[in-house]
Regions:
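C-terminal capping/lid region of NAD(P)-dependent oxidoreductase domains
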Residues: 224, 299-303, 315-333
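N-terminal Rossmann-fold NAD(P) dinucleotide-binding loop
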Residues: 171-172
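NAD(P)H dinucleotide-binding glycine-rich loop of Rossmann-like/cofactor-binding domains
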Residues: 87-165
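Glycine-rich beta-strand-centered segment in the early N-terminal region that forms part
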Residues: 22-37, 47-92, 108, 128-130
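Adenosine-nucleotide cofactor-binding segment
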Residues: 161-164, 179-241
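Glycine-rich phosphate-binding loop and adjacent beta-alpha segment
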Residues: 100-101, 181, 198-199, 233-306, ...
């Protein structure tokens, strides 16, 4: 079977595609034939050496495929079932505890950049009906991050308002989830072309932050005093503006650090506006099942910019690094 590995010391030129034998599942395990994966910033850090992983680690946290074989005692799955990976396979339900996130797919344990994988029967959830493998593969990290931020932490409801930043995977799927829920969305981008695509997906207002350095003030004017929810992907570069753009008693979900890991913020504004600021890192299996049902009911179709073959993973990461993509980049396995 084709298997992609990250070889020491890391770097896109140290991604190695080799051939390995498919193992047989043991008790409580299943074998999955992965059909597709998708790229996340976390995967880039694993691939380029930004995160230290074991030599020969199989990368990629996102995967969609079908159950190929069952180990003894497995009853929740049947051969042929279509499934998605879990970013944190040990976090099944409830509030996060440290032990839930010690196993990270494609990081501390092997990921989905291989044709076959033997994993715990609890390491996958059901794929949404009506989606292709590539579309489903965009959801376990970016989709679930947006879902937890908006629907679990934010308790988003019809009539609310949302600010999304940029046009990457989390922001685009957050826009789609919000529009399906009857929410008004303001999106920011530095590209007029991407701005038009955001409008096509339902964004009610688009602000070009390259042309409007006071974009958070503009959000306040458009929304009449701030938005109910903010998806912040910029971290250090955008948190101050996110705080300014949120309404009183609003929710800010910190989901990325694309603009830096440190931020200077106006602390009094946080408590004077009584804001709730959440750090959101993907989610658990129960949340992923809820997201799946919502995607089936709303018939949301994830946005894929371009699909690459597994052998072209380095080229896929190069596109991701260029920031020229819109939505998700996927791999066919």
């Amino acid at each position: 079977m084709r298997t992609l590995r990250v070889k020491k010391p890391g770097g896109l030129d140290h991604l190695q595609l080799d051939d390995a034998n498919a193992a047989e599942p043991g008790p409580g395990e299943i074998r999955v034939r992965w059909r597709a994966s998708s790229l996340n910033y976390h995967d880039l850090l694993v691939a380029n050496g930004g995160l230290s992983v074991a030599d020969g680690r199989i990368p990629m946290s996102d995967g969609a495929g079908e159950v190929d074989a069952l180990g003894a005692g497995v009853s929740r799955w049947a051969v042929g079932d279509q499934v998605m990976s879990l970013f944190f396979p040990n976090w099944q339900e409830g509030r996060h505890r440290p032990e839930h996130t010690r196993a990270v797919t494609g990081d501390s344990i092997d990921g989905c950049a291989c044709e076959y994988a033997v994993i715990s029967e609890n390491a996958v959830t059901r794929m949404p009906k009506g989606l292709s493998f590539a579309e489903a593969a965009t959801l376990p990290c970016a989709g679930l991050t947006a879902w937890q931020a908006l629907m679990v932490r934010g308790q988003m409801q019809a009539g609310d308002s949302l600010l999304v930043q940029g046009s990457g995977g989390v922001s685009v799927v957050a826009l789609q989830i919000a529009k399906a829920a009857g929410v008004s969305v303001i999106a920011t981008t530095s590209s007029s072309e991407k701005g038009e695509r955001l409008k096509e997906l339902g964004a009610d207002h688009v602000i070009n932050y390259a042309e409007d350095q006071n974009w958070s003030d503009t959000v306040n004017k458009i929304s009449g005093g701030g938005v109910d929810h903010v998806i912040d992907i910029g971290g250090g570069a955008t948190l101050k503006d996110s705080i300014n753009a949120a309404r009183t008693s609003g929710h800010i979900s910190l989901v990325g650090i694309l603009g830096g890991v440190s931020a200077k913020i106006v602390v009094p504004m946080i408590f004077s506006k009584q804001l709730e600021i959440h750090g959101v890192a993907v989610g658990n299996a129960a949340m992923q099942d809820d997201m799946t049902r919502a995607f089936e009911a709303s018939q949301i179709k994830p946005v894929i910019d371009r699909d690459f073959d597994l052998a072209e993973t380095a080229e896929a990461f190069a596109l991701q690094t260029s920031a020229q993509h819109f939505g998700k980049i996927t791999l066919s396995i």
